[in-house]
């Protein structure tokens, strides 16, 4: 059991590093795609989604959030997962071939200005390429949620969201994060709901910490606070931080400046400079 737990912990850390490596380009692609979805819905258009296997579940997940709700009660918006109807997909697959299961539906349901969202881990599925060609023929916009360069599908899309290449499971986990972020952008644009929930990790300024605290309070998040010099980090510090983190939903740790530590502890302190103390604290799992 312990060996298995260690392996799982390693996997979780690898996933965290993968998420941390996502840069500003991915963020910009998500923002642009979210605005495209919002514009389509605002113009009374419809969003169609398609994908295979695990990506099919992403399609239905996105549609459930759009038609139902993501964060707040609101009227439903128009979206259809082309993967959802087993009778339809098997009928088309039987009569026209599996390569046409999505394209046939795109031509039937899509109109100029509508949007088709194609989820794929490889970018090379023939039925998704055919769906893109069908969308082009009826003057729909095409958004690909892909990995790496997007494969062959990447060349057929008007917009791309490109997560890092990796295992199928890792890509699908990234796609899940992406679809939730897309829903945030859509609701923010169409309903004026602030992007959130607020997620902060690492070193922030006092003003940023105050803004986070206000945002968390509005969301009903309980926040703990502790502070200190943390010049020579020891077991007592770790126990205090662990206790503080366990007492609330989030923890903010205040850190004395170098000049403050010097006034409190003498000219020979701090031993560890402020920036390094901050990074050390931020690396702890309890903070």
Regions found by a protein language model. Name each.
Residues 25-43, 204-216:
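A short, well-structured juxtamembrane/interface segment
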Residues 38, 64, 129-133, 242, ...:
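Alpha-helical segments flanking ligand/cofactor-binding loops in enzyme cores
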Residues 45-63, 228-243:
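Glycine/serine-rich anion-binding loops at beta->alpha junctions
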Residues 47, 55, 60-191:
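Glycine-rich phosphate-binding loops that contact phosphosugars or nucleotide phosphates
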Residues 1-25, 196:
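Generic N-terminal amphipathic, Lys/Arg-enriched alpha-helix
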Residues 41-42, 136, 154, 217, ...:
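Anion (oxyanion) recognition and catalysis
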Residues 196-287:
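Nucleotidyltransferase catalytic core that binds NTPs
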Residues 20-27, 115-125, 226-237:
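Short, glycine-rich nucleotide/cofactor-binding loops
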């Amino acid at each position: 059991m312990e060996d298995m737990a260690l392996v799982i912990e390693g996997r979780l850390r690898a996933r965290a590093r993968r998420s941390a490596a996502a840069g500003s380009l991915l963020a910009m692609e998500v923002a642009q795609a979210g605005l495209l979805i919002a514009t389509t819905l605002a113009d009374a258009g419809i969003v169609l989604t398609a994908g295979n296997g695990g990506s099919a579940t992403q399609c239905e997940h996105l549609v459930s959030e759009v038609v139902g709700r993501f964060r707040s009660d609101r009227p439903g918006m128009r979206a259809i997962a082309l993967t959802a109807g087993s009778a339809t997909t098997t009928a088309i697959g039987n009569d026209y071939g599996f390569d046409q299961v999505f394209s046939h539906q795109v031509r039937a349901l899509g109109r100029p200005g509508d949007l088709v969202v194609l989820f794929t881990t490889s970018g090379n599925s023939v039925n998704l390429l055919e769906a893109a060609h069908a969308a082009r023929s009826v003057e729909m916009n095409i958004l690909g949620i892909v990995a790496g360069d997007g494969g062959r599908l990447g060349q057929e899309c008007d917009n791309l969201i490109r997560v890092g290449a990796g295992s199928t499971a890792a890509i699908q986990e990234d796609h899940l994060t992406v679809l939730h972020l897309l829903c945030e952008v859509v609701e923010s644009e169409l309903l004026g709901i602030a992007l959130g929930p607020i997620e902060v990790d690492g070193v922030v300024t006092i003003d940023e910490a105050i803004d986070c605290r206000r945002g968390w309070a509005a969301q009903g998040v309980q926040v703990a606070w502790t502070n200190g010099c943390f010049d020579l980090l020891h077991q007592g510090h770790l126990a205090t931080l662990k206790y503080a983190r366990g007492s609330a939903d989030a923890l903010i740790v205040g850190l004395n400046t170098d000049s403050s530590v010097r006034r409190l502890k003498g000219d020979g302190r701090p031993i560890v400079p402020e920036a390094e103390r901050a990074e050390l604290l931020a690396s702890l799992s309890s903070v």
